[in-house]
Amino acid sequence: MTVSCSKVLLSLCLFLMLLKATHESNQQRTNFREFFEIQLAQETREINEKNNQPLNQQLPQLNRRKRLWRDEDRRTFCTTLCPCEDRRKRAAVTPPTRKVPCCCP
C-alpha cells in the first residue's frame, strides 16, 4: 500500500508540475500576443500619420483652390451681360444655377 500511495503522490506532483508549466506557457503566449498587438497598432498608427502628413499639409491649399474656383465661376457667371439690362453688373449672392444670370432680379 505504501508503494501505491507514493506512486499516486508522485503522479499527482508530476501532473501539478505539468499543469503549472502549461499555465506559464499559456501566460507567456498571451503576453506575447498582447505585446505584438500593441506593437502592430503603434506601427500602423505611425504609418498612417506618415501617410497623412502630406495630405494634411495640402488640405489648406486644396480648400483655397476650391474656394478660388468657386469664386471665379461666380464672377464669370455674374459679370455676363444681363438680358434684362444693357449693361454689366456684379451679382448679389445668388448661386449661378438659374438659367438667367444672377445679376437679374
UniProtKB/Swiss-Prot annotation:
Expressed, tissue-wise, as follows: Expressed by the venom gland.
Q: How is it modified after translation?
A: Contains 3 disulfide bonds.
**Alphabetically ordered keywords of this record:** Disulfide bond, Neurotoxin, Secreted, Signal, Toxin
Spell out the subcellular localization from the entry: Secreted
Superkingdom field: Eukaryota
Give the primary localization class.
secreted
Q: Which interval of the chain is the signal sequence? A: 1-21
User: Single GO molecular-function term?
Assistant: toxin activity
Per the record, GO CC terms?
extracellular region
Q: Which family does the similarity line name? A: Belongs to the scolopendra neurotoxin 10 family.
State the protein's name: Putative neurotoxin 9
